[in-house]
Amino acid sequence: MVDSHLAEFRGTVIDSLAQGKGAIPKIKNLSARRITLNLPSPVVLGQYVIRSRGFAVVTVELADGSKGQSFGLDRGTPVADTVNTLIAEPYKEIFDGDPINTFDAILRRMSAPLSSGASLRGLSLVDLATHDAVARHKGTTVVESFGKKDKEHPMWAVVGYPPSRGPEDIAWEVKAAVAAGAVGVKLPVGANPKLTRERLEAALATGLCPVSTDLAWSCRTAKEAYDVVKGLDLAWVEDPFIPGSIAELVELRRLLDVPLSSGDDETHLYHPQAFIETGALDMLRIDATCQGGLSRMVLLNEYMANSKLAISWHVYDAIHSQIASIIDSPTFSIEYSAPGASVDPLAEMILDRRQSGHTHDGKGFRLAVPDLPDLSDALAGPPRWVSYK
């Protein structure tokens, strides 16, 4: 039996998208480019060393000139090339004014190449940019184009970057993030398990807000992960293992007395079903920029809502705050990072520019993606916490 609220959601979404669907212009241009931002200091997450952050920026232009954009980390994969060579032409051909129908149709036509990796990242960004363009054509935000209203979501700050910082360098940033309006903070794994724990203890010792941790795929076994965090009163523990370690997640969840979450950057169409159907997690980590865009979130809405699992959204706050306002699953956290932190340096640059008066036009995803050269520098640290609002 379908929940009455979910039935109402389905009706609202279908009605809103169908209204004027035939009047949505065809896509004139669809393209992507890669932007690389060199980091001021390397980010070391266990064995994962990041010296630059590569982004794919997708632009969709409708025949009337309405333009939508999206961006996301490409993790060193050829996302922009995949959009330009594999996705752009069939997507333009299929597009019927409804991004959700188009997403479903292109997946059914080309599921083999589009179901994972760089191509799914590319399709996800194309989907988001198309929703942005359609909303701008309508003169609305993306939320409004779905017949919905913006909700207030808990804003969490990602602190403690670069992870080489010691525990003595944590308390000030927790205080700054809370002063800027964050309701909680999340710290990445430190240089070694001992420092990871000491950094968490330093954040908890402030007593200012809940604290969570991203173990960033640094552990091999449930016991190893448990030993890092045991006894700490954390809001949640996140991403302890590389993707594929479902059995270890189930075992770690059994050991922990705090919530377990996982799923960052898992770019395949078995996410989040693999977690939900194995009972591996207490909370989902979702990233629409690599897991199917807004359209897949809408198509999975009833399934995810019925799972009763809350969602912690992975960075890209401007995009995810609107998606979280559209779907029915409860949002536990929307996260953002400070200019100069090098967590999501393009989003940090957008936030920094906004503080300097470079604002968006209030339409679509309310993003003003800067026109950067192919190679540029990320903002230098230390992190400068400013009010998200």
What is each PLM-predicted segment?
Residues E144-L256:
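Metal-dependent enolase-superfamily TIM-barrel catalytic cores that perform enediolate-based chemistry
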Residues F9-G11, D15-Q69, L73-R75, D344-P345:
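Structured beta-strand/loop patches that form or line metal/cofactor-binding pockets in enzymes
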Residues S70, M155-V158, V183-L187, V211-L215, ...:
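Hydrophobic faces of well-ordered beta-strands that scaffold small-molecule active sites
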Residues H5, R10, G340-K389:
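C-terminal extensions of enzymes
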Residues I24-N29, E61-H137:
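Metal- or metallocofactor-binding catalytic centers and their adjacent structured scaffolds
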Residues I27, G65, V126, G139, ...:
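Conserved, mostly hydrophobic/aromatic
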Residues D227, G244-G362:
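Shared catalytic-loop signature of beta/alpha-barrel
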Residues Q19-P25, N29, A135-R136, T140-E152, ...:
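N-terminal amphipathic alpha-helix/helix-capping segment at the start of soluble metabolic enzymes
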